[in-house]
């Protein structure tokens, strides 16, 4: 999974990226300090995997990972090439979802840049969201118009392309009204057509509402955050309250116990990174299954609804091709049997599942196959 972290200059985007990846990307109070996208790979915390590693003491423990990409700052007019716009838009196109960092704090020492890098403008989270949305929408409109032209020409020789042209014409009108592709009302057939266009404003989005420490401590009463949350609810997006500077402080603590105590002192149950990962999984409809043994204990990420052979294919295409069965027990069931697969097997909880089995979150699976 690849998440693109975007935002206008000076909203805390690179600070957040530095914190969640410990990558040390340059963070400065001027536009475009992130010109090439910085990439960081982050392990997905999973207590189930930790427990299996404790039980089996494998040669290798491999968590699922998320790739975060810190994408260059954007200004108004990017879809026409302003700022670093073209590079920004292409980098977004390569991601699975967008984490849009939105400034929800006041600080006269940090410029708020929208259109002019030399102009300090008032903090306006909803306006910032609108600025980036508009650039994505304009880039999408250009793409959709090309698809209309292509489908119209193709329809002269094959009438099946008429439907494609109709759908894209309706979408073009929607985009032209300043609305994102995410909010385009369509049925499953139309959705399948729309998804072939690889549209930027169709990508799932998480709004990371970045606050200072004072604002984050009582974020439910932060007026900026309230506005972002209401917008997210309207468009079916996720919103995550976060303090990037605080996350940076947490990331600098190497000792897990120190981190836990620091979070406890702040009255925070989970770090922003953990909450962002959970948010990403929920947004994209992802789950994890586990493989286990003396050689390796590993977590694998799949889409909800994935059947056993396709889950096996995440490990190796040969296992999918020669799939026979999946010997399965859910982690929670195994723990209810004293943390013993053997005890669970004696109770008949170890199941032999076939090709139609839909893998569940936390399933521990041993795949039988023959090629």
Indicate where each model-derived feature is located.
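Flexible beta-alpha connector loops of hexameric P-loop NTPases
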Residues: 74-80, 118-123, 130-136, 155-160, ...
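Long, contiguous hydrophobic alpha-helical segments, chiefly transmembrane helices and signal peptides
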Residues: 89, 95-98, 102, 136, ...
